[in-house]
Amino acid sequence: VLESSELAKKKGLSIVSGLCWRYDYGVRETINRILDGAIGDVVSIQENYLTGPLWHRGNDPSWSQMEYQLRNWIYFTWLSGDHNVEQHVHSLDKAQWILGDTNPIAAVGLGGRQVRTDEKYGHIFDHHAVCYEYANGVRVHAYTRQQAGCANDTEDYVFGTKGSCQVLKHEIRKPNGEIAWKYSGPKPSMYQVEHDELFRSIREGKPINNGHYMALSTMVAIMGRMATYSGQRVTWEQAFNSTVDLSPKAYEWGDVEVPPVAMPGITKEI
């Protein structure tokens, strides 16, 4: 993917990744202020993506196992990476953005499949918690859950030496808790902005290329899954150089093996 991104850059082609919060005006302005020092040096970030269960498309006797998995792709790691990749990557991407798109050096995590246990939900977990370690001492604590009847919260909490921030509230606070700044500008749909800026870049011959940070943020999410599935401390080098292959034996309309649910301390992910 990184090579393809570089090739697109050489050819003057645009890539807009779908990591949509980078196109939200309020989030952009808020994170730009963090990057400009509005809360001092960032010391830690808490990323919450705590939601209820998602959809399931059911089954049909006429479907092959391959078709069934494609229709219910979020529940199979070869298609989704688990929900801390396909969903929580949006939160992790904001943390990466705030930290200058630098790689974490390691991750330690825990997770499991406690509530969503029916075999129709494939083999993914229903909760993950990961601590990412960065070379400058910053820790990113990332929590994601898809369980019914629990407290929900989707927010980015950023803590600095001179204040704190809730990114999705577009709000920066002083150390005493008083609001120091709050975004009050326009709030167009970030999905529309993605398309507008992509089309503008093509018309004006000024390519946008999100490929590099898209690949790295996705790798951060995958690294987190490796940590929660294995129960081990996973380094960036181990994750990036992993030879684990999640793909099916053949891409054809037929039976596809469903891997067993990961067991931390037993499952090998590296």
Language model features with spans:
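Active-site beta-strand termini and strand-to-loop segments that position acidic
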Residues: C131-N136, F159-T161
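Structured core elements
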Residues: Q46, V108, C131, H141-Y143
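Predominantly a Rossmann-like dinucleotide-binding segment in NAD(P)-dependent oxidoreductases
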Residues: K9-S17, W21-G122, C150, E155-Y157, ...
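Phosphate/diphosphate-binding loops
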Residues: V140, A148
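Serine-hydrolase-like catalytic core of hydrolytic proteins
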Residues: V1-K10
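Short catalytic-loop micro-motif centered on adjacent basic/acidic residues
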Residues: I15-G18, H141, N210-G211
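C-terminal helical cap and adjacent loop that interface with cofactors, partners, or active-site loops
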Residues: L79, E86, H90-N103, V108, ...
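Short, surface-exposed connector motifs at secondary-structure boundaries
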Residues: K10-I15, V138, G205-P207
